[in-house]
């Protein structure tokens, strides 16, 4: 069997070239504060891949996506090893657009910090009197530039996103910026409405898009996972403070309260983190993870 090497390795994913397609492996690595931790979180990669598959299937009436298959039998022999099962996706090749498409339905995190200062989030003025974790009257689109690994993404205004896209696609900056904004909000609205019926609030999330060979907009990367989104339990939701969440907040909190930790988590924190990921997956999909 031929040993294959990834053509690109991110903090969590490995990308392999498969001729006319790509193969994307979500590893069990976990990153916090842009640092890859020494621990691996068993089943995390499978949660990311299978949850993305669920959302891709749910939203294909709104926009096509890059997923071809998550069945390793459809892939080269190298990916039929046990270690790739459940966490591997064969995808269409896309020309990725240089914008991270962030949508916020609730005010929290960096958005809340910004609002407290001047009543705006990423340059968008919001109503007075909002409390932390309040639902916004309408979801807001707050794009950012895509940074190289090790750098931070930079929040930009909608107008700046037009200029940024214009550099890559002369004469099409506004058209693509509007398409990204409208698609992002439409996807968020459908998925947030669905998640609420399953007891989960999607406070905010991030999408990435690319163009196929015909120039059509296609959803790429991952979709609505605990790595790219804030999921809150609807039960007990109460504005006025932060909310418990189904993500790596356990890990972040432990690292913050234990300086000099060498970027290694105790097993108890690893176990709590994956329990949250699995709980979110099971609530949203209605089934146990098969991996």
Which residues fall in each region the model found?
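Generic recognition of stable, solvent-exposed alpha-helical segments in well-folded globular domains
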Residues: 46, 50, 175, 179-182, ...
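A long amphipathic alpha-helix within ATP-dependent nucleotide-binding catalytic cores
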Residues: 171-203
């Amino acid at each position: 069997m031929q040993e294959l090497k990834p053509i690109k390795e991110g903090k969590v994913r490995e990308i392999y070239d498969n001729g006319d397609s790509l193969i994307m492996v979500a590893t069990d690595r976990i990153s916090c504060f842009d640092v890859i931790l020494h621990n691996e979180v068993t089943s995390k990669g499978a949660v990311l891949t299978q949850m993305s598959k669920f959302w891709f299937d749910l939203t294909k009436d709104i926009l096509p996506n890059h997923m071809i298959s998550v069945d390793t039998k459809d892939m080269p022999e190298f990916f039929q090893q046990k270690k790739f099962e459940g966490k591997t996706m064969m995808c269409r090749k896309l020309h990725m657009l240089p914008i991270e498409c962030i949508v916020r339905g609730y005010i929290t995190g960096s958005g809340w910090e910004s609002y407290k200062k001047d009543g705006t989030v990423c340059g968008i003025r919001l109503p007075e009197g909002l409390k932390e974790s309040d639902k916004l009257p309408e979801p807001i689109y707050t794009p950012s530039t895509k940074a190289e690994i090790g750098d931070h993404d930079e929040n930009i205004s909608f107008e700046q996103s037009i200029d940024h896209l214009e550099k890559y696609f002369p004469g099409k900056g506004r058209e693509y910026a509007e398409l990204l904004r409208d698609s992002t909000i439409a996807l968020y609205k459908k998925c947030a409405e669905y998640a609420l019926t399953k007891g989960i609030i999607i406070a905010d999330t991030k999408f990435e898009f690319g163009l196929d060979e015909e120039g059509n907009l296609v959803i790429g990367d991952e979709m609505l996972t605990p790595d790219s989104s804030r999921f809150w339990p609807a039960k007990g939701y109460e504005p006025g403070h932060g909310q418990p969440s189904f993500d790596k907040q356990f890990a972040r909190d432990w690292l913050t309260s234990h300086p000099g930790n060498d970027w290694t988590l105790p097993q108890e924190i690893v176990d709590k983190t994956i329990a949250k990921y699995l709980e979110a997956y099971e609530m949203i999909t209605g089934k146990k993870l098969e991996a």
